[in-house]
Amino acid sequence: MKVQTGATGVLERTSHYLKAGLLRTKPAWFDVVGAHPPSTNLTKKPKLFETGGQKSDPSESIFTKINGEYKTRTSVEDRKQKNNSVSRVPKLQFLEDQLRDVFYHQHPWEFSRPKVLVETSGDDNSKCDWSHMLQFNKPLDGESVVQRTLWLLNRSKMDGKSITLFDAYDEARFEFYRLRMEEEMSSAVSREESTMYGAVFPSPHLEHGVNQEQEYIDIWTKVAGDATKVKTASKDGKSSNGSMGAEDVVEKTTSAWETEFVEEESS
């Protein structure tokens, strides 16, 4: 019996198996497929596009005669996968990401400002009213410029005005500059007023760390200066007295580093 590979012959084969006793129980789908048999064979078959026909194995075309010689093995170029971008998953590209990249390349110091690392739902910007850049529940940053630019573009389409992406970005950027200057000016004025009324501002953690480090740097600078003087004096004594003058040079039993700290502890 010829083996049937087509999916349309499954009903016929199953009926033969039932009559021959190979299958004892009827499958659950037997009656359904018998009432509604498949009408289309979905098996893919090779198509002959040329009159001369198509070779069964496409790799045979590699070893054709080229310049009077036969190729005995495939080269790297033959084995290279061509059109590999067809099966590659395309990258998601958004206009917002391009605007963020442009803004933070033009304003790298915006990265130094503190950020609130709180997990959100991801659509908090859609809940804000971007008809104005300054928001109540969101600090002023580069994301404000991005969302304000998108709002200006969408608004221009609704009003029927022709505004380019660069014009919308520049308008949002200059508005950001104005609000940032107002924010810094307000902060400076409030600090001066607080100082005038007797407020004392503690040094920040960074400045405190620098001051602590500077104290040790000053100590080691003085110790290094004394050690340099001792080393220079010993060299001058050896050069003036010659080899015989080495006996007159008194060696120090303690280093200059230890002496400095001992003097500080005693004082």
UniProtKB/Swiss-Prot annotation:
**What is said about its interaction partners and assembly?**
Component of the mitochondrial small ribosomal subunit.
Q: Where does it localize? A: Mitochondrion
A GO cellular component annotation here is: mitochondrial small ribosomal subunit
As for family, the record states: Belongs to the mitochondrion-specific ribosomal protein mS23 family.
Q: What is its main location?
A: mitochondrion
**Do the record's keywords include Mitochondrion?**
yes
GO MF, one annotated term: structural constituent of ribosome
Span list, region Disordered: 230-267
- Pfam families per record: MRP-S25
Which PANTHER family has this protein been placed in?
37S RIBOSOMAL PROTEIN S25, MITOCHONDRIAL, SMALL RIBOSOMAL SUBUNIT PROTEIN MS23
- Ribonucleoprotein: is it a keyword of this entry? yes
Which gene name does the record give?
RSM25
Stated name of the protein: Small ribosomal subunit protein mS23
Alphabetically sorted, this entry's keywords are:
Mitochondrion, Ribonucleoprotein, Ribosomal protein
Superkingdom of origin organism: Eukaryota
